[in-house]
């Protein structure tokens, strides 16, 4: 059976190794008007897909993330099912946004930006990784 996440990771690494940063950004920009959407996700799923994978790019290139309101909209559709899909266990912790009115989970509050929360719940970063980066910003 094919693991899509593994495939996507390999494809992204390949593209990054053969394309310039400008080419990668242009590739994303030319797809903005593409009518494709993830199966079963509708418009909200398409937005989530683009924001999450857009963060994969902006984080790697050190660029500004999408606006907080856009990320919050994606977070609004997130919950236990998403955590399970990505293999994330909050383990008695609650993620609380510092830049929007949003939280997920129960337990000890962990205060993070909406961007960092989305990176955590999609298993792009761990709580210790984003907590350390937040401390460095203080």
Could you say what each language-model-derived stretch is?
Residues 9-13:
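Active-site flanking loop/helix segments enriched in acidic
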């Amino acid at each position: 059976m094919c693991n899509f996440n593994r495939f996507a990771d390999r494809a992204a690494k390949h593209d990054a190794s053969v394309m310039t940063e400008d080419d990668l950004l242009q590739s994303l920009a030319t797809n903005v008007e593409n009518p494709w959407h993830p199966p079963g996700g509708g418009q909200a799923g398409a937005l989530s897909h683009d924001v999450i994978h857009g963060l994969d790019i902006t984080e790697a290139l050190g660029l500004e993330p999408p606006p907080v309101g856009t990320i919050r909209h994606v977070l609004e559709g997130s919950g236990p099912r998403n955590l399970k899909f990505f293999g994330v266990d909050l383990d008695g912790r609650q993620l609380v946004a510092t830049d929007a009115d949003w939280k997920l989970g129960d337990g000890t509050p962990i205060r993070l930006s909406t961007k960092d929360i989305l990176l955590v719940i999609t298993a792009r970063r761990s709580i210790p990784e984003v907590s350390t980066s937040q401390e460095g910003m203080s």
